[in-house]
Structures are given as structure tokens and as C-alpha cells.
Amino acid sequence: KPDVLPFIDNLLRFVQAGSEVSALLGRMPSAVGYQPTLGTEMGSSQERITSTKDGSITSIQAVYVPADDPTDPAPATTSAHLDATTVLSRGLAAKGIYPAVDPLDSTSTMSQPWIVGEEHYETAQGVKQTLQRYKELQDIIAILGLDELSEEDRLTVARARKIERFLSQPSFVAEVFTGSPGKYVSLPETIKGFQMILPGXLDNLPEQ
């Protein structure tokens, strides 16, 4: 009863190959030039990756997003079959934040209170709400400046920036980018850190 962990890099190549074969067969292309059978082909390949009573199979797949457009048929069709997605952000990378994972666009079907626990779930929701509000305020900040925000919004921005930095806590895989040695931080410690940032217990500390 083997347990299998396949890595797929890159799933867009599978889609492009199907598109080329479809064109050679003379089929009429669908949206953005993809093959009309894209949904069927993707479903057929993804449904083969399933656990049975004889063993489990978990796949890690790299999905290139053309023009950073998540509504493109290729990534959109793929994401419908995934249990979790980790989305990398060019904006975070430009800020020097690594790993440049966007917590707002990333998803997981496991993020449920009966799976991860009530404390973990509520903390994660609080983090996402704070980051979402910060995202909504960025246009106002760019046009009018931070000083034009209300006191409450300025606190939200400061805490959101702390959260961004906290999410970049020194990981071993990011050593080459940050120059900081990797450090393991346990899940309970991470949750506790967020629980201190969200209510403002660390407002007196700088972002860094």
C-alpha cells in the first residue's frame, strides 16, 4: 500500500500541448485560443490523482498564470480541482518579503474550524480581514497619503504591515534572498504572534 507524492512542473505545459494537438486536429478553439476540450482534459487528469483504500496520493503542482490573470481559462480550470493553492506575489517580492506568498489569494479547503481548531481559524480570519482592509486603503494612501486616513485606519495599516513582515519570518528556503539564517517557528508560536499583533499589543514596536 504505497503512498505517492508526485510533483508536476508546469501544468500549463500540459494545457499548451493539448491546445497544439487540438489545433492539428482542426478543432475550433475556445476562449483565448485554448482547446474546446480543456475542462474535460483537465478533469480527466486531475481525477486520476486520488487516494484509495490501497494507498494515498498527494500532488504538488506548479501552475503558471499567464499575464498574472487568475481568470485565464488554464489556471481557472486547474484551481477548481485543487484542495489548496499557494499564490506567489510579485508585489511582495518587490518589497523584499520572502517567501512572497499572498495570503489573500491563497486558499485551502482545510482552513475550517473543525479541522485546524477554533483558535487557529479565528486568528487566520482576523489576519485576512486586516490585510484586506489594508489592500482597500492602498489607493487612498497612494493618492492622498497616509496622513489623510482616520486614526483607526492608520492603526490597521501599521498592523497589516507588521503582519506582512511577520509572514516573512526567516525560512530556510529564503536564506539566499534575505541573507538571514533560517529559523523554525512552531505553529502555536506563529498563532500567538498574530494574536499579539491584531489587537495592537505590539503597536509600540517598529515594522521591522
Swiss-Prot record:
Compartments in which it is found: Plastid, Chloroplast thylakoid membrane
Keyword Ribosomal protein carried by entry: no
SUPFAM superfamilies linked: C-terminal domain of alpha and beta subunits of F1 ATP synthase, P-loop containing nucleoside triphosphate hydrolases
Domain of life: Eukaryota
Major localization class: plastid
A GO cellular-component term linked to this record: chloroplast thylakoid membrane
One Gene Ontology biological process: proton motive force-driven mitochondrial ATP synthesis
UniProt keyword Ion transport present: yes
Mode of membrane association: Peripheral membrane protein
EC number of this enzyme: 7.1.2.2
Classification via InterPro entries: ATP-synt_VA_C, ATPase_a/bsu_AS, ATPase_alpha/beta_chains, ATPase_F1/V1/A1_a/bsu_nucl-bd, ATPase_F1/V1_b/a_C, P-loop_NTPase
Catalyses which reaction(s): ATP + H2O + 4 H(+)(in) = ADP + phosphate + 5 H(+)(out)
Molecular function GO labels: ATP binding; proton-transporting ATP synthase activity, rotational mechanism
Protein name: ATP synthase subunit beta, chloroplastic
Gene name for this UniProt entry: atpB
